[in-house]
Amino acid sequence: LAPSGQRHRYLSPQELKRLGEVLDQPAASETSGTAATIIRLLVLTGARRGEIEGLKWSEVDFNFGMLRKETSKTGAKVIPLGRAALQILDDQRQWTSSNQVWVFPAQKGDGHFDGLSKEWGRIRRLAKIADVRIHDLRHTFASVGAGSGVGLPLIGGILGHRQASTTQRYAHLADTPLRSAANVIGSEIAAALFGSTAAVGANKERADA
């Protein structure tokens, strides 16, 4: 899914398991707990870092199971969500106030969380995947999809699908092959990351629990 000549790095099932074990460790701080939740969502959705770090609650559609990221003149990018990703977002919702704009608010000020880089350096060392970049989580999503028999057009659709910016134009995606494919891929990754989909818990490691 990337142009020829670009660096490719995917996490193996064993590496995903190690990553999951590190993410499940008790959080040393609220920052590390937030970073762990963001990393889970990145690998379970194939979304770009900025799409999750800067996610607003108004962009999360629990009814149709998708993220609807506003862009510019192109309308909106729709990211279908599997059950594991939806559960993480639902858990996260329990930890944020009803008037909070951001899914992952900053500890100070009115912006969103932006401390992922520092935390990722620590997490990947502990998981023994020191050469893995945050963007490689997106590559991993695509690789798992291909290995699960999901067609490349569907994977490409999940990673970069765009729709016009009205509810009527995107709501029908809830029952399309894109949503089904996202769930297949997410379930495969969750099985490796958590041991089973039942183990998914977005905030069980938070220091302020």
Positions of PLM-derived features:
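C-terminal catalytic core of tyrosine-transesterase DNA break-rejoin enzymes
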Residues: 37-51, 122, 136-162, 169
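Basic, Lys/Arg- and aromatic-enriched nucleic-acid-binding interface segment
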Residues: 1-49, 53-54, 63, 73-75, ...
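Conserved short hydrophobic patches within well-ordered secondary structure
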Residues: 20-23, 44, 144, 154, ...
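Catalytic-site neighborhood detector that most strongly recognizes the C-terminal catalytic loop/helix
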Residues: 2-3, 10, 68-74, 84-86, ...
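Short, polar N-cap/turn motifs at the start of nucleic acid-interacting alpha helices
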Residues: 59-66, 130-131, 150-169, 176, ...
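Active-site/catalytic core of tyrosine-dependent DNA strand-transfer enzymes
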Residues: 10-16, 64, 82-130, 207-209
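Short beta-strand segments
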Residues: 77-79
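C-terminal secondary-structure termini that scaffold catalytic or DNA-interacting sites
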Residues: 21, 25-28, 91-100, 105-110, ...
